[in-house]
Amino acid sequence: MWLHGNAITYPNEIDSRTKRFFDENEFKTKSFEGLDSPDIYDETDADILIDNTKWPWIPVPIDVPHKEIFEEASHLLETGCFTAHRPQSSGWMSLCIHGMSSVHTNVPEDYGLPDEWEEDESHWTDIARYCPRTVEWMKDTVRYEKYTRVRYMVVLPGGWLYPHTDRDRITGVGATNIAINNPDGCKLVMEDWGEMPFTPGSVFKINTGYKHAVWNRSKEPRIHMIFDGEPGDYFKSKVLEGYKNHA
């Protein structure tokens, strides 16, 4: 019954570039061994690791009440609160819990605003009151030192996100991605690395300097969260733990 009565349009058919990217990369596998130098593998400072690793992703072992968060995010989707996110995609939608506003889901530059607004003007948006369990978890478990943009990210059934990079380098990991659900048939694929191993409740620091794309071939929305901001000491310790456990 999701989307019943809503004006959200259904996704367009996947474009040839994204389809070709999936054909070429979906089933690739590649070892992380030797990707980082020995001094990075032995690093005990999480900041140095986060800034210098070349891993495409790092699992972060923290607990996520993903079923409760899914209920809150689904309700907001059903009631038409999400906005379309970025061109060159279809069925990709977003909603800010923390940021410049609930609908400013991209960087300030995309709205003709100064870059510093990301830091200076981010706050709990009006949407935060409608997802109290999500906010509680962010405050009590994730415990970032400072949040900037924190978003629910939805890919509708049949939706896709074109191959792209979010940074101009492959050194260091960027935003945090949390799988609230991850329906069978929906995949994030990285060039040369294949499918990211998302399961409901999994958390990763992602190296978005590698080209990646998403395609939801399931019959249900795929709901994730993306965190931007400054991780606190607890979260950074879990990044280091996840790295060491998989090195």
Segments and roles (model prediction):
Residues 1-141:
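Non-heme Fe(II)/2-oxoglutarate
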Residues 137-159:
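A short glycine-rich, His/Asp/Glu-containing loop-to-beta-strand
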Residues 146-147, 161-175:
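A short beta-loop-beta micro-motif enriched in histidine and acidic residues
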Residues 154-156, 169-185:
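Short, conserved beta-strand element in jelly-roll/cupin
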Residues 157-159, 201, 209:
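Tight coil/turn sites that cap or link beta-strands
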Residues 162-164, 187-188, 206-218, 226:
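Short beta-strand His + acidic residue motifs that chelate non-heme Fe in jelly-roll/DSBH
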Residues 174-180, 203-205, 220-237:
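A short hydrophobic beta-strand segment most commonly corresponding to one strand
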Residues 179-199:
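A short beta-strand-loop-beta hairpin characteristic of the jelly-roll/cupin
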